[in-house]
């Protein structure tokens, strides 16, 4: 280690020892490289996931002195010194929950077969299996797979043909995948691979990070990757309605002196916490500040269940009586079991076992609470005429597409609300790096921001983001100032975000075309040439061409790139009603994803001929076509 490396104080050393002990679950004196990556995921680093992984890989080469893919405490300290010297560990949190029930498996890929270990949580596997079994128990397409046994590895085998994953994505975000595009019968390795591509590209389109997962990983059932993807998909569904514009009853959670805009900026996790505390306050019980330590004794849960259970006096069904006698049970595990028996009366015994409650598993307890909220929120929209209803307008489809695109790339923090979550420009900087615009991170103010002058720090970031856009990225940002980003001016923010997405899309094409700069005219020419070569009658004059509303140019292009991928009997070609156009568009988007095109656009974008999103569809298909030639 070079002498220029930052020294670590005795106080910091003690904190590191404490953190190390918490992830050294078997007290062996070592943690695996994968646990280290998990640790960084837990830390609030203003860097995207892929960047953290790169750093860890590079530094492991130095820190893992004996190359055993395990890190001792001494190696861990030298690793932290390296990170401190790179100005990355400033926001390192020492609160890492001790994780129990971790299964470690040896690496299986050719790269990791030299003895790396990946760990996965047995509890998560059991919880997800039970959730999927219940969710898909009546689906005829899943009869050969459901029910899965939570106590063996059947989950990893059952997901291998892609059908379950596609079904779970549609449960979380209905209509994401056109069922006609899923291969269901007489599956071959090729048609299974198509299903997995469809699942991965569709997961990406709903905001899941899939940058390091390939179809092969799912075929091989790599547990840590499968569980990571499943959790993201399940979470999208659990959190879908924990959003004020979609669920106005959440306005009831407004605290004294809090305005609606503050409430609307909260993440689903923060809203859930506020929801639990709203009911605990009504029950006269102390509030909680997390879904781990504070719920371990189950007592807060008893009160929550008692508050939200139907009383039979409204239109929420017959009364359900919650038995509180288990509340005074002395044994934590038994008390948790009594509590879950009461949750079962509400049809909500999901995600956690008594042991998961007592150990304070934050992920599974969050899922348990989200499911309770979705089933019995116990909220009623207040008759408050002071509420500005304009604030309750939900995000547009375009805004959601941009948000999902960013999240799928692994930006940190996760974007829940497009404008308020971009207010400090940290995610904008990460996107700049992804489009190869260099960011000088020493110019960037990082959280936590001070209470006084904190917003000024964010505006400085936004000013730098606009400056980079104009001078380095050569974007057209006329009339856009840093303050516009900070204040969430929708028109001006979208102008920047669109140019980021456009550049990202075109960079992929330039890489395939030996670096040749790609523009709209080149894409249109390639599309028409490819259609003509395949003897298709369709063509496009621009990305505003009205014929695109039928999706026929898109479907014909897919057929030209990947013959037999499109089933012609699924397409309506003449006398198209609005419903026919939408059906064609749904099928086109799903089949494009199935052949490997990572498309974020929605079927409506084709039907309504939204030129920006139409461009991304054709650009992604061109990328697929060029890749095939290579």
Swiss-Prot record:
Residue numbers bearing the N-acetylmethionine modification: 1
PTM: Phosphorylated.
Domain EF-hand: 11-46, 51-86
SUPFAM superfamilies in alphabetical order: Calponin-homology domain, CH-domain, EF-hand
One CC-aspect GO term: actin filament
Pfam families per record: CH (PF00307), EF-hand_7 (PF13499)
GO biological process, any: vestibular receptor cell stereocilium organization
Gene Ontology molecular-function annotations: actin filament binding; calcium ion binding
Region of interest called Actin-binding 2, as start-end residue ranges on this chain: 382-626
InterPro entries, sorted: Actinin_actin-bd_CS, CH_dom, CH_dom_sf, EF-hand-dom_pair, EF_Hand_1_Ca_BS, EF_hand_dom, Fimbrin/Plastin
Region Actin-binding 1, residue ranges: 108-381
Residues holding Ca(2+) 3: 64, 66, 68, 70, 75
Domain (Calponin-homology (CH)) ranges: 122-238, 266-377, 396-505, 517-626
UniProt keyword list: Acetylation, Actin-binding, Calcium, Cell projection, Cytoplasm, Metal-binding, Phosphoprotein, Repeat
Function: Actin-bundling protein. In the inner ear, it is required for stereocilia formation. Mediates liquid packing of actin filaments that is necessary for stereocilia to grow to their proper dimensions.
Quaternary structure (record): Monomer.
Protein name: Plastin-1
